[in-house]
Amino acid sequence: QDVRAFLLAKKEEGLKATTLNLYNSAIRFFYRNVLHILWDDITVPRMILEHKLPTVLTASEIDRLLDAVDDIKYKAMFAVMYSSGMRVSEVIHLHYDDISRSNMQIHVRDTKNRMDRYTILSKRCLDILTQYWFEKGRPRGILFPNKFTGNYLTVSTLEQVMRRAVADAELPKTATPHCLRHSFATHLMEQGIERQNIQALLGHRDPKSTEVYLHVSNKSLIGIQ
């Protein structure tokens, strides 16, 4: 009962279900393996996780977002995210040599699962990147360096820029830099691109990670009907 009360108190503090389940697992391990006390999963159940569909912007909303970004560096970064489906951290760690103009591809090296991959470089994105490159001193190492330190930008910096652009463009407040990756995948799904190809472009090891975009795509089609 004390553990149940503790977890309920943490829930009232605003902790998410995933965090509460981590608390639950740690306490359960301590009870079973250290104190050798039976654990009652009925009295202290695990929290049910909410599986919310990701926020997806329409093509016109993407245009409004990019138009709302004044700094060409951040406009280029957001364009890369939508054009390629790259994760925020992957775009931050891009280097000049990762951009292949001849093949219209981007070499993604610093990945979440440590597996290199190639993804799409659209003509529109290349045009924005080219404008950025000439206007910002033609960087040859880190493609999007911090202008003060020359090092990598932080995720929080991009999130701040995104929040301002979202407000200026009057887009859904739930839109984050990562939703550009969601939008990329969903739009490909709606265009009929095979799921395996989308999985490869996104760098998903598990096909189930890609299936969420099928659900979002179906939801969009229902809205059209």
Language model segments and positions:
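Conserved catalytic core of the tyrosine transesterase superfamily
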Residues: 1-225
